[in-house]
Swiss-Prot record:
Its EC number is 3.5.99.6. GO terms for molecular function: glucosamine-6-phosphate deaminase activity; identical protein binding. This is Glucosamine-6-phosphate deaminase. Pfam families: Glucosamine_iso. It comes from Latilactobacillus sakei subsp. sakei (strain 23K). InterPro entries: Glc/Gal-6P_isomerase, Glucosamine6P_isomerase, Glucosamine6P_isomerase_CS, NagB/RpiA_transferase-like.
């Protein structure tokens, strides 16, 4: 793993952008995208640039079950607001949170991933070490799955909703096994609340108790952290 320490999210976003730009110059065509607060400055930097994704494909990590694409808290909406409206891709894939047949939707999304191997995957990380919505206990070889969100994840995401009761309790998420198939992975983490998860990811044992520790199995991972998120690392 390569650890890049930055002073703030703006610098972190710039570092991530440089990796994206280099990938695009080297014919990367499929970009795995994440939502949440950690990649926002990265997306702002991409939007302000002259990068062109009109010949590229995006594949998102996850979506809440029960939210329509036009719901302001859905990840479809997040991606349109933060990236797609300004930087369109030829094709953009996200799980369908309103799918009437969830098992069929999981199979469909696994096929999307198989048909569009990811060149560069963007990740954030939860306080409990989750990547995507792969909560502690998720198998390292898992494919796309419906996930029951943990209490800590629901509480962490409540800030985006009017009431905690409005936070969906389930999501469809690309599995850890699917994430590990990406050629290159870039993870953003900021703030003291992520320090424990980052220590477990980088220096802890490979354990399903810390889903992101699975990244130790991958040979091209860059972790972009501020000093607070890196504060528990031994070096």
């Amino acid at each position: 793993m390569k650890i890049i320490k930055v002073k703030d999210q703006v610098e972190g976003g710039q570092k991530g952008f440089e990796i994206f730009k280099e990938g695009l110059a080297n014919d990367a065509k499929v970009f795995g995208l994440a939502t949440g607060s950690s990649p926002i400055k990265f997306y702002e930097t991409v939007v302000a640039s002259d990068l062109d994704f009109t010949n590229c494909t995006s594949v998102n990590l996850d979506e809440y079950v029960g939210l329509s694409a036009d719901n302001s808290q859905s990840y479809h909406y997040f991606m349109k607001e933060n990236l797609f409206n300004k930087k369109p891709f030829a094709k953009s894939y996200l799980p369908n949170g309103l799918a009437s047949d969830i098992p069929a939707e999981l199979k469909r999304y696994d096929q999307v991933i198989a048909d569009n191997p990811v060149d560069i995957q963007i990740l954030g990380i939860g306080q409990n070490g989750h990547i995507g919505f792969n909560e502690p206990g998720a198998a390292f070889d898992s494919n796309t799955q419906e996930v029951q969100l943990t209490e800590s994840t629901i509480k962490a995401n409540a800030r985006f909703f009017e009431n905690e009761a409005d936070v969906p309790t389930k999501a469809i998420s690309m599995g850890i096994g699917s994430i590990l198939k990406a050629k290159k992975i870039v993870l953003f983490a900021y703030g003291e609340s992520k320090a424990e998860a980052i220590k477990g990811t980088v220096e802890g044992p490979q354990t399903t108790d810390v889903p992101a520790s699975a990244l130790q199995l991958h040979d091209d991972v860059t972790i972009i952290v501020d000093e607070a998120a890196a504060s528990l690392l031994s070096k």
